[in-house]
């Protein structure tokens, strides 16, 4: 990192979303110096997630434009503001959309990985002081996104929204731990706490669903049923540890429902099911496929604005449980190091999710990759921005 840039604005290339349903504009912006309790990061690698596409689609009620999207990113700290003690210039880091201040009632409860420190301002697309660090060539302010904004050569985040990692961990893989991989893996290990011999079903087998599958396999689940309407996902599901694959459009008997199919396959239902689709009908199916008396269904997928879930109360009265999971229940600053170690020793697959690589200037094509049945993650390299 150059000392010449410390404390000064930096001009760099970013992908700006000016409006919903429009291509991102790859252009030069100005990134202000970090203020107190803020960190400026040179993003080395970033990936495109369905959440970015969801906001760009205009369906996100918290979506604000213009903004710099991106929340799966890793890089190197360029400079820090006053009173930052957790990271320093030169550190290899991952940006965190789920902050961890360690002081709020959420962090001190021991019950959740949610944090209240920056939630209000993060949802408004600004830094904790209510202002933005991004400006376009016309001097117009640009909103932040999920406290990360990794679709920029440089970004500024709150010091509670970044974690230093082992510099030996390759950043192109590490960036995926900023969302999808951690979300699914953590949901299996922390939220559900899958145990040896448990039966598991995963609805939706993208990066999050496959990460649930590998977490369940690591814990020794006896049956892991992957459910997806895209047969191209079958090979990935097997690779990450699924024992069975069901395509609801092809593998059900006449008039049979997916719930009936799963109950038939598991002698009464599953110990754990995971919804990774965001489809509220599938959320209901996932719950009702759980075993009476103890089955738990974990909701990971984010539904569209205004959507509601429903089931017959008897499903819950008879012992089934609905739970939610954000970022896999993982506390980003205190527990990310453990995930990095799992990756380094081979217990957690990460690089296997990188099916596509592109230079940053092809970011709009990377969004198109998401709709390709063969794509799990497209990783963009910052050095190839210009």
Swiss-Prot record:
Gene Ontology biological-process entries: amino acid catabolic process to alcohol via Ehrlich pathway; formaldehyde catabolic process; furaldehyde metabolic process
Note, other: Requires GSH for oxidation of formaldehyde or of methylglyoxal, while oxidation of long-chain alcohols is independent of GSH and enzyme activity improves with chain length. Present with 8370 molecules/cell in log phase SD medium.
GO cellular component assignments: cytoplasm; cytosol; mitochondrion
Binding site for NAD(+): 50, 204-209, 228, 300-302, 325-327
Keyword NAD: yes
Keyword set includes Chloroplast: no
MF annotations from Gene Ontology: alcohol dehydrogenase (NAD+) activity; hydroxymethylfurfural reductase (NADH) activity; S-(hydroxymethyl)glutathione dehydrogenase (NAD+) activity; S-(hydroxymethyl)glutathione dehydrogenase (NADP+) activity; S-(hydroxymethyl)glutathione dehydrogenase [NAD(P)+] activity; S-nitrosoglutathione reductase (NADH) activity; zinc ion binding
Location of this chain's protein in the cell: Cytoplasm; Mitochondrion
Enzyme Commission (EC) number: 1.1.1.284, 1.1.1.1, 1.1.1.-
Assigned protein family: Belongs to the zinc-containing alcohol dehydrogenase family. Class-III subfamily.
Cofactor (UniProt): Zn(2+)
The record's free-text note on cofactor binding: Binds 2 Zn(2+) ions per subunit.
Main localization of the protein described in the UniProt heading: cytoplasm
Highest taxon above the source species: Eukaryota
Pfam families: ADH_N, ADH_zinc_N
Disruption phenotype: Accumulation of S-nitrosylated proteins.
InterPro entries: ADH-like_C, ADH-like_N, ADH_3, ADH_Zn_CS, GroES-like_sf, NAD(P)-bd_dom_sf
Gene: SFA1
Residues engaged in binding Zn(2+) 2: 101, 104, 107, 115
Induction pattern: By formaldehyde, ethanol and methyl methanesulphonate.
Reactions catalysed according to its record: a primary alcohol + NAD(+) = an aldehyde + NADH + H(+); a secondary alcohol + NAD(+) = a ketone + NADH + H(+); S-(hydroxymethyl)glutathione + NADP(+) = S-formylglutathione + NADPH + H(+); S-(hydroxymethyl)glutathione + NAD(+) = S-formylglutathione + NADH + H(+)
Protein name: S-(hydroxymethyl)glutathione dehydrogenase
Sequence positions that bind Zn(2+) 1: 49, 71-72, 179
Assigned keywords, A-Z: Acetylation, Cytoplasm, Metal-binding, Mitochondrion, NAD, Oxidoreductase, Zinc
